[in-house]
Amino acid sequence: MALPHQKQSLQRLNKPLGLLALLALMTLQSCKHENKIYKSECDIGKDFKTISFKQLMDSLDDYDKQYIEISGKYEEDKGISALVCDSLFSNASNSNALWVDFSQDCPLYLSGTRQGLFEYNDGGFTQINDKKVTLRGVIVLRNKGKKDRYKATIERVSLVKL
């Protein structure tokens, strides 16, 4: 036999928990930001194969001159423009990275605007350093990047998704 006080206590406890869960859900929704997609009109009509960073590095020879879509962490600094694997369990050295060759022949604009990726906008430049990005471009094995320190280059970058 249940006591009447027990049922009332559970009802009082459920209301605050429900409100707390609702508040947590609303907070998580507000933290979600929209992806920014910068596109170029280069390579329209090309088919891009989506591939994981590890799969590309394991079979790089198979992707020479192939159009791919790949995700990783972009790193830039003086003399550095590289895409590295964003996995915690991978080697992020230059020998396991791609040189990223952005070309003026393929200007990248924020979808639906004429705002360029590398243009000064809203008081600053778009920050992509140390961010996870998705890139589309063509893999070129003969180009090993600055001082030939990289496995290959992704050229003709026609999409950057932040």
Question: Where do the language-model regions lie?
Answer:
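Sec-dependent bacterial lipoprotein signal peptides
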Residues: 2-29
